[in-house]
């Protein structure tokens, strides 16, 4: 694979574009067809921003990647570290410029800008700062839905998806930090500061709040859409509770997987309900 393409991790970029389309459908439902141009622009921009973020990540992790990921473009010598850094700047800048000059809704640009600033802060310090880094990852995971909602001029329905993704991701990141505690001696993670038990209780509390929040969205739907949402979100929450169960039983890897699966099913519940409105 071309090293410039590999740096962007194209799989992640494509998944981001899919999330944008999903968020737009959650917000607009069948009327999404009226916003084809805006959604296309947002997908291209989002892919560039994610690609730039991944290139920046590879630049910052270039020393550890010599051992952990020697086949990546920088440690393999396919591209220099300086070139990768410049490439990340070009992608991040271009992704923002596209939004600024092509979309009338400046709030889409604002969300993207905040996301880029959060990404840069994460890669240059917050990653090693524990809970602040967890919050940053949570924001970036949820912001794509607000971004998509703004693109179709109806962010309201995506606020719930943002909240769910934000809280569930923070919980998942804390559980991941618990799992990685032995190898994260150089990071000031929440488990390293307050211990595993307290950290796990906080992660569970945040996830329970996310589960409760998911049911507050039912007033957005009625009829078949309401039935579809309740059914889908209940399945999602069963997976979330399974994640809590596995975390309590010290199976942190499976717990993270359960939470991620629950987030995916929750998104499908919103999509299905939006299509039935």
Predicted features along the sequence, with ranges:
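Select subsegments of transmembrane alpha-helices in polytopic membrane proteins
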Residues: 8-15, 80-90, 132-137, 197-207, ...
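Intramembrane alpha-helical segments
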Residues: 2-7, 73-160
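Small-residue-rich segments of transmembrane alpha-helices in multi-pass membrane proteins
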Residues: 17-23, 75-76, 135-150, 191-196, ...
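Structural signal for membrane-spanning alpha-helices in multi-pass inner-membrane proteins
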Residues: 20-27, 95-103, 119-123, 144-152, ...
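Membrane-embedded alpha-helical segments that form the functional core of polytopic membrane enzymes
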Residues: 17-60, 95-99, 106-120, 155-175
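Solvent-exposed interhelical
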Residues: 45-96, 166-221
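Extended hydrophobic alpha-helices typical of membrane-associated regions
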Residues: 2, 219-277
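C-terminal ends of transmembrane helices
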Residues: 2-3, 63, 117-130, 177, ...
